[in-house]
């Protein structure tokens, strides 16, 4: 019986140390230059799934936009990057009401049945918001749809 306790202790101790190590977070907050905790500092939109492993990932910051798209099955991958100006950034972020972001509801993933998952990630100075298949939320999704439409307007035609 003492051997079992010893083995359990041998497994438990390193796990506890790893847990403590990973829970210590000494990251400093990002310096965004903004004093408003509701200012948006990062947007990510992705559409991933399907039988062939299609993906489109768009990352947007105040000064740049980056797109990755491809099909995993065919091993095709394309990337596009561009700088954006403050007018474009303001146009994108104006579609989002930060006060209602917590009210948006996600839906279950559809990738397990060869469906696509649409994911939005919006980071403010204060909080990080993630939504998966939020289009089922008929009340608050409208702002994400407007954001998606604005993003599509920025992309070159070969990536739409």
Which stretches of residues belong to each language-model region?
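A short, structured loop/turn motif at beta-sheet edges
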Residues: 60, 83-91, 122-128
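Post-signal-peptide N-terminal segment of Sec-exported extracytoplasmic proteins
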Residues: 46-77
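Short, well-ordered, aromatic-rich surface patches in folded extracellular/luminal domains
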Residues: 6, 24-50, 102-160
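Short beta-strand segments
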Residues: 56-58, 78-80, 128-132
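Sec-dependent bacterial lipoprotein signal peptides
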Residues: 1-22
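Short, low-complexity, polar/charged sequence segments that are solvent-exposed and flexible
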Residues: 61-66, 79, 85-88, 138-142, ...
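A short-motif feature that recognizes glycine-rich, charge-decorated loops
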Residues: 68-103
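A generic structural signal for short, solvent-exposed coil/turn residues
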Residues: 16, 35-37, 52, 59, ...
